[in-house]
């Protein structure tokens, strides 16, 4: 057994494991304002057409993932997910570093993220990583929520 996490680009064969991991990671933290799964396998596969999932593995087991999508001079990252059983051990930070490095390699000057305003712990977490608030945006109207919510938009200069 290795203590090392390896980061790699996901392939379509990883879609099922990525879907399960994202839904597991988001289940408890989002259940107070939205029901159901966070993402479907079809949505993961569709996302792979416009961006990339970076995955963190240890001994062949998927322990985390993050989605990165280039958008001109900017890149977007989201769906940062870590297996709840290993959270607070650095996997999320390692994935964020990998996402930002991927953005730099693509020539993107900024990395953007959208966080749900109801997740009050997130703004400070991302501020500590160098992200600043740039505004707000609407939550997707097709997603039924238990509470009114919106996104807080944040951005970080990559170089």
What are these regions (language model features)?
Residues 34-35, 39, 90, 94, ...:
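Residues at secondary-structure transition points
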Residues 4-6:
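Extreme N-terminal starter segment of soluble prokaryotic enzymes
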Residues 45, 53-54, 109-112, 116-123, ...:
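C-terminal "cap" of GNAT-fold acetyltransferases
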Residues 2, 48-49, 105, 128:
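Short, well-ordered coil/turn elements that cap or connect secondary structure elements
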Residues 61, 83-97, 104-106, 117-123, ...:
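Conserved glycine-rich acetyl-CoA-binding loop
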Residues 9-15, 19-85, 96-98, 102, ...:
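Acetyl-CoA-dependent GNAT
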Residues 2, 61, 145-146:
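Short, solvent-exposed loop/turn segments that connect beta-strands within catalytic domains
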């Amino acid at each position: 057994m290795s203590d090392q996490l390896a980061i790699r680009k996901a392939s379509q064969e990883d879609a099922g494991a990525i879907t399960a991991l994202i839904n597991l990671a988001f289940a408890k933290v989002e259940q107070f304002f939205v029901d159901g799964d966070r993402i479907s396998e079809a949505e993961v596969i569709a996302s792979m057409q416009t961006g990339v999932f970076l995955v963190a593995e240890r001994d062949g087991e998927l322990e985390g993932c993050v989605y990165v999508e280039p958008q001109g001079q900017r890149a977007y990252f989201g769906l940062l997910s870590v297996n709840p059983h290993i959270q607070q051990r650095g996997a999320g930070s390692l994935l964020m570093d990998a996402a930002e490095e991927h953005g730099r390699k693509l020539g993107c000057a900024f990395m953007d993220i959208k966080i749900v305003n109801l997740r009050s712990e997130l703004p400070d977490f991302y501020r500590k990583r160098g992200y600043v608030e740039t505004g707000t945006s609407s939550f997707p109207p097709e997603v039924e929520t238990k509470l009114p919510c919106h996104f807080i938009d944040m951005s970080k200069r990559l170089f």
